[in-house]
Every structure is written in C-alpha cells, then in structure tokens.
Amino acid sequence: MKLSKNNINSMFDSISNEYDFLNNIITFGGHVKWKNDIVKIARENNPKTILDIATGTADIAIKFSEIENSKIIGIDISSKMLDVGREKIQNKDLAKRVVLIKGDAENLEFDSDSFDIISIGYGVRNFENLEKGLKESFRVLAPHGKLIILETSVPSNPLFRFIFNIYTKVFIRLISSIFSKNPKAYTYLEKSAKNFPSGDDFTKILLKSGFKNVKIEPKLFGASTIYIATK
C-alpha cells in the first residue's frame, strides 16, 4: 500500500511528538549507531554542503554538524516533524549550521550539482514516486558526491527473517498500541518496510537512476541497510 504525499504528511504530523521516543524503543537504540555510521561515511568526502532528505526530527542533520566547516540543510514534508527538529537544533545552538526547510524530495528546489553529500534516513520507502525522488537526488548531488541511504530491510537469512516478521507483527504493533496516538501509522510503516525493495533489488533501482559504485552495509542481521552510491 502506497500513501500519497498528503497522507504521508498527515501521518508524520500526527506522530511527530512521539517519533523519537518510539524510534529508540523499536530499534533498541540501534538507529543511533547507524546514523553515526552515516556521518563516518560522509566524513570521508570532506563535504562542505550536505542535504538530509526526509530529515524528520533532524537526528541525522544534527549529527552532520560534527563534520567541521559543513553547511547542512534538512528537508521534510511534515511541518510538525520539522518543528521538533528545530527545537532540538535551537537547544544545541546549531541554528547557524543546520537549516530545516519544508520540501518535497521529488521536487527539490536546489540547483543541480549543489551538494557533496545527500542522506536519506528511513524515508526513501515513503517516496510517492521512488524513481523520481532518486533522480532528483542524483540531479542535485555534485559530481563524485555520495548518496547515503539508511533504510529498513528484510533479512535474507530464513531464521533472521522469521524473527524479523514476528518482531514487526507483534512487538511493533504492541508498542505502538501502548505509546502512540496513531497506532495505524506504525502498522503502515511496518508493512511498507516489508514491501520495499532491499539489497540487490534496491541496488538495481539506484543504478537505473544514474548512480554507480553502489555499496551495501547490512545492519542488525539485515533488518536495516545502509546503501552508499556515487554520482
């Protein structure tokens, strides 16, 4: 089931105040390390300009501030997620380094070849038009720049895949029913994670969108994956 941009916007608006808390529970805090891995990968390019697409509450955008002399822009379709992110940025006194903008990943309002690094953390599967969104990322990425994507994936190992399916069907639904004001949002996120192409299938889509030298780094036995692609 694919949701429209308006539905995605409304869904994330409804869970904006609980998103960080539940993300910590659902990933057992693992997302923090994986986002640190994104920064480590990005640092290799010595980037000056960084775009974090689907920035949400700005976790990754804020982490990028660890890279000296970098200017970071985060965009997201959800105004309320951005409000949470802006508060975090203000609390860390990073307003001069990290700027958040309401924007659409499939229609980026930036010049071509503008960014040394583009990141997308747990957002690419929510693109209404995946290929269009990836081609827009390719357009605004500078030559030799890197696209770094962190996304949920389904483990290839049968045992881990079985555990993953039980975990998503039982644990995530239970936790969201207890703590979330909109449990249906997490049901959608769980289903979209299972239906999204991962591994080699997603690599083919990245290559078709113009990227090259795609590398895959599975996390937590393949329950999440970092994809690194070059322009």
Whereabouts are the PLM-identified features?
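A short acidic, Gly/Pro-enriched loop at the edge of an enzyme's catalytic core
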Residues: 106-117
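Core SAM-dependent methyltransferase catalytic element
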Residues: 209-231
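A short glycine-rich, Lys/Arg-flanked "PGG" loop and its adjoining helix->strand segment in the class I
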Residues: 131-143
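Conserved alpha-helix/loop element of class I SAM-dependent methyltransferases that forms part
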Residues: 27-48, 63
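N-terminal, positively charged/glycine-rich alpha-helical extensions of SAM-dependent methyltransferases
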Residues: 1-20, 168, 179
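C-terminal alpha-helical "lid/dimerization" subdomain adjacent to the S-adenosyl-L-methionine
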Residues: 6-7, 150, 154-205, 209, ...
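Class I SAM-dependent methyltransferase SAM/SAH-binding core
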Residues: 49-107
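A short SAM/SAH-binding and catalytic strip from SAM-dependent methyltransferases
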Residues: 116-130
